[in-house]
Regions:
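Acidic, metal/ion-coordinating pockets
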Residues: 1-197
């Protein structure tokens, strides 16, 4: 809340603190905790919030979050009891489509706590490039977890990937140039870079 973030993406270090801590802190914070793939065992709904809709300068921005899907392999079950973690690649396109249909956002950001990976679908904790290759209707994909600074954009410059690394060494920066005609977004061009923190 102090940093005035619009939302935060749940990461493995949040879950490591256990239910007593993260459930209490989440209730105390105004900032939404996002993790659409952390699913409750009792009712199949998300344990955390799936997404947030933000309005800025006449634009509607959707931020959809996801936790690392490999949590159960690292942490003892009592830390995450009552939920399971769905692979992000298997669920995110449907969530993007749902949010687009329900809210008609001008901008869609997918914020994840998954590593960059190689894009070959082989590592559950590293779904970043797998998502980048497969997602449609997304403007920016934010990744983390592996502490590996990496940015890229697709050939059309309509989809950007940002992993700022770790330890506040970089600020991941995404720039989106938007053309609006008759009140509607008609074109978007993205760029990404890392700004070193000195």
């Amino acid at each position: 809340d102090y940093m005035k973030y619009d939302a935060v993406c749940v990461g493995n270090h949040d879950i490591e603190t256990g239910h007593n801590v993260y459930d209490r802190v989440r209730r105390q914070m105004k900032t939404p905790w996002l993790a659409a793939n952390a699913v409750r065992e009792d009712n199949g709904k998300s344990y955390f919030q799936d997404y947030v809709i933000i309005k800025r300068k006449g634009l509607k921005i959707a931020v959809i979050g996801a936790e690392n899907a490999n949590i159960a392999a690292w942490l003892t079950p009592e830390l995450w009891s009552g939920m399971r973690f769905v692979p992000i690649v298997s669920m995110m396109q449907a969530k993007v489509d749902e949010v687009r249909a329900k809210h008609s956002p001008d901008i869609v950001i997918v914020a994840t706590h998954t590593a960059t990976g190689k894009g070959d679908g082989s590592v559950l904790e590293a779904e970043g490039l797998d998502l980048f290759k497969s997602l449609k209707g997304v403007d920016f994909l934010l990744c983390a977890h592996d502490h590996r600074p990496f940015v890229t954009v697709n050939e059309e410059h309509t989809f950007g990937f940002i992993n700022s690394g770790s330890h506040c060494r970089n600020i991941g920066h995404g720039h989106l140039a938007i053309e609006v005609k008759d009140g509607k977004v008609v074109s978007k061009t993205v760029s990404t870079d890392l700004i070193p923190v000195k």
